[in-house]
Amino acid sequence: TTTTHMGFDKDFILIEKDSDIKKIENILKKFLLIKVGKKESEYKVKSLDFDLLKKIILLGDFILIEGDGSKNLPLKAPKDNEPVIIKETNLVIGIMGFDSINKKIKDICHRPELVSKLLRKDLDEIIDYKDLVEIAQHENGLKKNVNCKYKVIINKVDKEENLELCKNIANLCKKSNIDVVFTSYR
């Protein structure tokens, strides 16, 4: 589910009220993984009421809640009221796209002005691997409002020649006690 808004697709189970909890319990008897949300529009789901969300949390072994989206862009910095992390959270995973490296801030970032400010770079400047580390470890970056265990996923590491750069990123993050996982879905 989400604490903000996210794209709606046919796989979401829409719930509105407490009586829908029984529906979720029955579905979980058949499926190990479900997506739950409250319909906002034809294209979006929004956050559940907090009381309803707390009841859903009790149903699952593992609940993944999107707390801050990036409009399908590989990098962002959160605005003042983001991310929305509920106090029951025990792990926050910050996600960035490796494909942002060697691209201009203004072209590759959601809220580029905030990324520019965080990195102390102009909007026309290029993102490098050290910028990913800075965003991962900065209190106004992916680590904002985090009061629990924290890890980072850098996805879209799709070429073997990028592995050395990944080692550099991992070593820099390790100095800040941040575990990083690199992924590729190709």
What are these regions (language model features)?
Residues 27-32, 60, 148, 176-178:
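A short helix-to-beta-strand connector/capping loop
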Residues 1-5, 12-13, 59-63, 67-71:
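Conserved, well-structured core segments that form the ligand-binding/active-site neighborhood
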Residues 1-43:
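N-terminal phosphate/diphosphate-binding loop that engages ATP/GTP or pyrophosphate donors
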Residues 37-40, 155-158, 185:
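Structural motif
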Residues 2-5, 178-186:
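Beta-strand->loop->alpha-helix junctions that form or flank phosphate-binding loops
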Residues 43-58, 68-176:
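Conserved catalytic-core segment of NTP-binding enzymes
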Residues 1-2, 34-38, 63-67, 94, ...:
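General beta-strand structural signal in soluble alpha/beta enzymes
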